[in-house]
């Protein structure tokens, strides 16, 4: 997974070291190259081809999400150039840096093996998203939208954290690879339904 995470992170120094005229071309081109590299994950259909590690890995479920995430940066760069063309060069590079941070955090989120790491990275995406909404939002109500986004996201993430703590106490681990080795049956009780609702609530809040 480092072949995707590390190049995505290195887009930050590329953004600030590139000249003002070439920063859009450089970041867009290299982000498209990262996307082409990530497409290789779609052909890793069996466990022998997966590069497992204690922190990050890709499987047939997360690989399509990773490929879609790598499309996020180049498409947003192409769509927003005209919108922020009147901004200063410093603000343009700051905007690109926030998009790069958002993509890197999303890649690490979808490839995380530990559920608590997934939770931390998933909530960390709130920071660049909130700054982009409140600073470069197109509507005049962007500040109110940012406040509502922050409030609903934090409120929706608390049940997910409680559910993860409960899973940790129940199974003894939050590692997804180790949890697949657990063959204990899942009881269909009302508490498990509440647990499922708590886990899905954080994603439903961010869906809009």
From Swiss-Prot:
TM segment ranges: 23-43, 60-80, 93-113, 114-134, 147-167, 185-205
Subcellular location as annotated: Mitochondrion inner membrane
Entry-linked InterPro entries: NADH4_N (IPR000260), NADH_UbQ_OxRdtase (IPR003918), ND/Mrp_TM (IPR001750)
Enzyme class: translocase
Keyword hit for Methyltransferase: no
Molecular function terms, GO-annotated: NADH dehydrogenase (ubiquinone) activity; ubiquinone binding
Protein name per the record: NADH-ubiquinone oxidoreductase chain 4
């Amino acid at each position: 997974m480092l072949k995707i995470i590390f190049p995505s992170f290195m887009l930050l120094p590329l953004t600030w070291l590139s000249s003002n005229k070439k920063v859009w071309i450089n970041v867009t081109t290299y982000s498209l190259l990262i996307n082409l590299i990530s497409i290789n994950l779609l052909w890793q259909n069996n466990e022998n081809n997966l590069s497992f590690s204690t922190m990050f890995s890709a499987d047939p479920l997360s690989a399509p999400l990773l490929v879609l995430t790598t499309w996020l940066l180049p498409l947003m760069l192409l769509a927003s150039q005209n919108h922020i063309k009147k901004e200063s060069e410093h603000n343009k590079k700051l905007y690109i840096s926030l998009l790069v941070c958002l993509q890197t955090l999303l890649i690490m989120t979808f490839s995380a093996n530990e559920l608590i790491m997934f939770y931390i990275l998933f909530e960390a995406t709130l920071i660049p998203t909130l700054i982009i909404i409140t600073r470069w939002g197109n509507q005049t109500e962007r500040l109110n939208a940012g406040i509502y986004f922050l409030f609903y996201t934090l409120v929706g993430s608390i049940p997910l954290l409680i559910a993860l703590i409960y899973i940790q106490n129940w199974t003894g681990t939050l590692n997804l690879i180790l949890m697949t080795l657990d063959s204990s049956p899942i009881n269909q009780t009302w508490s498990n339904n509440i647990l499922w609702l708590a886990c899905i609530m954080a994603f439903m809040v961010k869906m809009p």
